Structure formats: structure tokens, C-alpha cells
Amino acid sequence: MCGEKSLLQEIDEVNIAMGLISLGARMQVLESETSLSRRRLLRLYKELRGCPPPKGMLPFSEDWFMSWEQNIHSSMFYNIYLYLKKTEQGRSIEMLMKTYRLYLEQCSTCSDEKPVLGLTRAWTLLRFIDCGIISRKACSVCGGGFIVTTEFIKNPFTCSLCSPPSRALKKSQVSNTGLLGTFAAPEIMTA
């Protein structure tokens, strides 16, 4: 086996690629996280999804994660990730997939509605954190861990659950289905 991948390693890579594709990963994520060729990944994607993968650049702005709703979802995802990283072993990509599945369970919405945080954005978030573009900070009111850009790391920090913007309150009045599905009513947030 001089320099060749074993069959078991290749099967493991295909399983990871299949898991990523089923969770909605873009080609750039697949290419970065597996050692399979682009050609094999394209073929696998088409077999699983029935269509070619979407084209275009990956999102590359930390600003998306700072918007109130996206920040809550991204922070929840990252807190789950930190917990799993502390309590379990495995490759970082396997940890990402497991975390994302748990995130989806917590944020179950209508089956036709996309989750706020897609897998590719979750992957990008972890890369931003590794690079130091984004970090985690405790809210000075509730003590919860939230992601912030490094320029906003200064004290004090108040999360958007403790101090929701008016559009968040309007959204909760339109569809009052709970804290994680959309957002809780104002009296629940202040209790």
C-alpha cells in the first residue's frame, strides 16, 4: 500500500461526503474536507441530489453572523459544538456534522422552510473562529455565550435575546411559536 489510500479510508471519505451532501454542503466544503477528487464529488452529489451542485462563491462576511436572528442561531450552534468537542472524540468534520444535526433538531421548523443557519455557513463560522475573525463572549445580562466579531469584544456585551431589536418583537407577534422556531413573546424574554 505504498502511498495508496486503503479501501476503508476511501469508504470513510465517501460516507463523510454523503453526510455533508445530505446536510446541504456546497462543493467547496466537500473539496476542503474530503480527499475525494472533484470529479467523484460531483458524481456523488448528482447521484444523491439528482442535480448538479449550486455554483458561486461561498459567503465570506462575518457581518452575516452578527445580525440578531443569525447571531442567536450561530451562537447556539457554536455552543453545541464546544460541548461536543469537550465530551467526544472525532475528526472536526464529523463533529461539525453531528453538531449541525443537533442544531437542526433544536430548530425544527416547517419541513419546507430552510434553517436560519445552513451547513456551509456553520462551516464558515468555525473557520472564522479558528482564524480569530469571530470569537465568543458572555452576555453581561444572562451570561449566555454568544459569538461576536473581535472588534465588538469590548465590555459590556448584551445579547439580542436580552435586548431584542424591535423587528424581533414584531416577528414574534406575527408567529408566536416558541423561542427557537422564531422567538418568544416579550413577556417570556423578560421573565
Curated annotation (Swiss-Prot):
It comes from the Bacteria. InterPro entries: FlhC (IPR007944). One of its GO terms (cellular component) is cytoplasm. One of its GO terms (molecular function) is DNA binding. Its main location: cytoplasm. It is found in: Cytoplasm. One of its GO terms (biological process) is regulation of bacterial-type flagellum assembly. Keywords: Activator, Bacterial flagellum biogenesis, Cytoplasm, DNA-binding, Metal-binding, Transcription, Transcription regulation, Zinc. SUPFAM superfamilies: FlhC-like. Pfam families: FlhC. Zn(2+) binds at residues 139, 142, 159, 162. Binds 1 zinc ion per subunit. Its cofactor is Zn(2+). Belongs to the FlhC family. Heterohexamer composed of two FlhC and four FlhD subunits. Each FlhC binds a FlhD dimer, forming a heterotrimer, and a hexamer assembles by dimerization of two heterotrimers. Functions in complex with FlhD as a master transcriptional regulator that regulates transcription of several flagellar and non-flagellar operons by binding to their promoter region. Activates expression of class 2 flagellar genes, including fliA, which is a flagellum-specific sigma factor that turns on the class 3 genes. Also regulates genes whose products function in a variety of physiological pathways. This is Flagellar transcriptional regulator FlhC. It comes from Enterobacter cloacae subsp. cloacae (strain ATCC 13047 / DSM 30054 / NBRC 13535 / NCTC 10005 / WDCM 00083 / NCDC 279-56). The gene is flhC.
